[in-house]
């Protein structure tokens, strides 16, 4: 167990569903805080057993074959964490406790170990124990739709928010909780840029608001500019070779937008008070904005209504 008194003053916890989610969605943020002296703890909820395999010689590892992909992805995730400078990684409940549920509506949702079926309080208890150990001031996870509707992402959100509630009762919940997001203006700029191109990732989309992760700019709370870490993020993504092929549209976008795409990440604020910001919407440039060195007592929800 980690002795919290030996950890850096700024402690960030991220809760993700599968290996590779951390790199794609929050890799620059993680690398930024790791490089600037923060303690970054990554929790991954499943091994990603139901993922596709984009490395031909490893195709038989897939769930329909040898069903060994999850074990292989442990190594990919370890390599990604090294690229990001993250040394504290945990699997929720231990590696293999929860299984990748697959996409919504598939029979894999009903697997006995599917994360989608996990008892909420039991799963949250694993996260509460980690919070008690590390005492993060800031937690990052997904919104209630799991960013794009994958059952494991939705469940990661539910587990993280339930863990927050349970930890709050004991007095050590994070002071701020953020959800990953993508501003509408950024998506609209991307749609304009790729219109008519052969590798258009927005093909078939008429308006940005059709995308499940589109967030109005005025709802964004933080813009983390970690462009200096764009190479670390890309290296972490490339570590997940079974999931992200070299010809992925993600790298195509990166080739066009460079460090802006790889190094800038956005968040909405679900819990806590928004700190000082800039620009027309007062976007924070630091997830710890407004917090003292140690976690403060303000754990009120910010503009979030209804159940998590």
Swiss-Prot record:
Its cofactor is Zn(2+). Its EC number is 3.5.1.103. This is 1D-myo-inositol 2-acetamido-2-deoxy-alpha-D-glucopyranoside deacetylase. It is an enzyme of class 3 (hydrolase). Pfam families: PIG-L (PF02585). Binds 1 zinc ion per subunit. NCBIfam families: mycothiol_MshB. It catalyses: 1D-myo-inositol 2-acetamido-2-deoxy-alpha-D-glucopyranoside + H2O = 1D-myo-inositol 2-amino-2-deoxy-alpha-D-glucopyranoside + acetate. Zn(2+) binds at residues 18, 21, 153. It comes from the Bacteria. GO terms for biological process: mycothiol biosynthetic process. It comes from Salinispora arenicola (strain CNS-205). Keywords: Hydrolase, Metal-binding, Zinc. PANTHER family: 1D-MYO-INOSITOL 2-ACETAMIDO-2-DEOXY-ALPHA-D-GLUCOPYRANOSIDE DEACETYLASE (PTHR12993:SF26), N-ACETYLGLUCOSAMINYL-PHOSPHATIDYLINOSITOL DE-N-ACETYLASE-RELATED (PTHR12993). Belongs to the MshB deacetylase family. One of its GO terms (molecular function) is zinc ion binding. Catalyzes the deacetylation of 1D-myo-inositol 2-acetamido-2-deoxy-alpha-D-glucopyranoside (GlcNAc-Ins) in the mycothiol biosynthesis pathway.
